[in-house]
Amino acid sequence: MPPTPPPAPTVLVTAAAPPPDPGPARCVLATITRRNEHSPLCGVKSLNALDNILAKLEASDRGADDALLRNTAGRIAESSLANVFAVKGGIAHTPPLAEGALPGIMRGAVMARCRVRETPLAVEDLARADEIFLTNSLGIRPVVALDDRGFAPGPVAASLADLAGGRG
């Protein structure tokens, strides 16, 4: 039986002040789930991304703000809430979309603004990074911890704060 035609669309618009700047992020590597970069749903931004929800819950349980998800090959794909950038030698590196990253709006803005290479990122690449930051529609957030490794907020993320309306 074919699906019934959808009803006429409804548009709902709400306006509210943006949430307060959450400050730098403390992250962990998710251990309970992986991002399936081969899934046809991989590039879909959805509130129903259970892997991301589970990773975020794991981060909270471990006292962190966010979790970085690895893909099925063990490389970094994204965080539970954002795209990931690792800076080395003044060049920002971010996983290609084929690694499981979402094509985020802020990701695109960062790529248009500064020197970025789409590079598959191993966990070891993050450990050797000069700085790590996350991007999503709410802004740019420096990462100050990944598991037991500390990082200082860096100049690349700071130089991009205006992209996020001063947040970052």
Residue ranges of model-derived segments:
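Helix-start/capping segments and mature chain N-termini
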Residues: P2-G168
